[in-house]
């Protein structure tokens, strides 16, 4: 239940710009995050080493830059960043983007 997890307010997530609010469940097998990316905010570019990431958009529109491509994930769509690849994401809209991100630990 994400409502039972304390919300973190992060400025410049992974070296990006703006605000990200996150409730994260973390154990030794995965990191599962319920996040709100504010208008104009972005993450920094980062690589998934020893993990991958799946981001599912609950509301809003998330612009994702993955390797050499740009894609827009809308409500009900997801973005997948395989292990070893780079990505960064941003909210190019005037509305919050709410998404669920799952980052398993690969062994």
Where are the regions a protein language model picked out?
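Short beta-strand segments
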Residues: 33, 43, 69-71
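Short loop/turn positions at the edges of beta-strands in beta-sheet-rich folds
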Residues: 26-29, 39, 49-51, 58, ...
């Amino acid at each position: 239940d994400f409502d039972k997890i304390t919300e973190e307010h992060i400025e410049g997530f992974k070296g990006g710009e703006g605000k990200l609010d996150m409730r994260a469940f973390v154990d030794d097998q995965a990191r599962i995050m319920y996040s709100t990316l504010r208008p104009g905010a972005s993450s920094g570019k980062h690589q998934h080493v020893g993990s991958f990431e799946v981001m599912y958009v609950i509301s809003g529109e998330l612009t994702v830059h993955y390797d050499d491509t740009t894609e827009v994930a809308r409500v009900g769509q997801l973005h997948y960043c395989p292990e070893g690849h780079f990505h960064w994401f941003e909210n190019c809209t005037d509305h919050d983007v709410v998404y669920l991100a799952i980052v398993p630990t690969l062994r």
